[in-house]
């Protein structure tokens, strides 16, 4: 579901606040109007996305706005959901309520980028996260990577895990580190689905991702051992065959995750998986956590894919954001190539 907030203003004062906190629960408008009570009459309502006009898991927000007799509704954006798109605005206007659209629209699009991609493509929004040295290495020549970045950057990564529905790594990461792939924060966190790409099912049955604390999904190929797949299913994992092989068909894998209503994926795999996802055009945003360290030319590179012959054809990042995180830096951007994303 999208991130939606609502503010009710009457005579220049905020009289109601609300947010959509959980799927199936009342929408932001309902919470805000309940808080405002009778003061909603004649008020202006500011909301992130246009109010819904259809019956879903909750009643239409337009009905509640009409009951409250608000005078004006200001929305950041039209909802891209085909069930909603334009219908909510039209219904409010037909009822005589003034509707203004487009206020802070770019900010809304950035906040709800994952929702917008999923609702229009049924494919998850993929964020690639990498911790690396200034010379682009994710580990030393021996494979040691504990720790590339400092504690503040590592905590920021746990926040990212909390904000994504799934974490995805390659089997090499599981074999090398046996990670838990959980969000560990000082406060209760949402735990993502744990996803591993493993074309031949080399993942150990004793791996911590099969501890049953959160769901695990293994993406594999037709070349994998069926008996091993059955054993993983007995451990509670979901095994999805994504193509004939020899490698996992990553685009098909993303479609399969989308079919399971996974709208966002945090990609934390090594250089091979990161490179393959970038080359396939499946990464929507890159977050690079740079540590002020140098690992040398024999360190393990962050991106394992053949580069272009010309610099003009290199993958570049747009919409750049740079943040100081403890003693490290986070560079975030949207990957694009010449001629399109």
Language-model features: where?
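Short, well-ordered, mixed-charge alpha-helical segments that flank or form enzyme active sites
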Residues: 54-56, 81-84, 107-112, 134-140, ...
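Short, small/polar residue-rich loop motifs at catalytic or cofactor-binding pockets
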Residues: 1-3, 125-126
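A short, flexible N-terminal coil/short beta segment enriched in small residues
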Residues: 11-18, 107-120, 208-214
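Zn2+-dependent cytidine deaminase-like catalytic core
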Residues: 8-107, 193, 217, 222-224, ...
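Generic secondary-structure signature for well-ordered alpha-helical cores
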Residues: 38, 94-97, 101, 116-120, ...
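Proteins enriched for Cys/Gly/acidic motifs involved in redox and nucleic-acid/cofactor modification
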Residues: 24-25, 89, 103-131
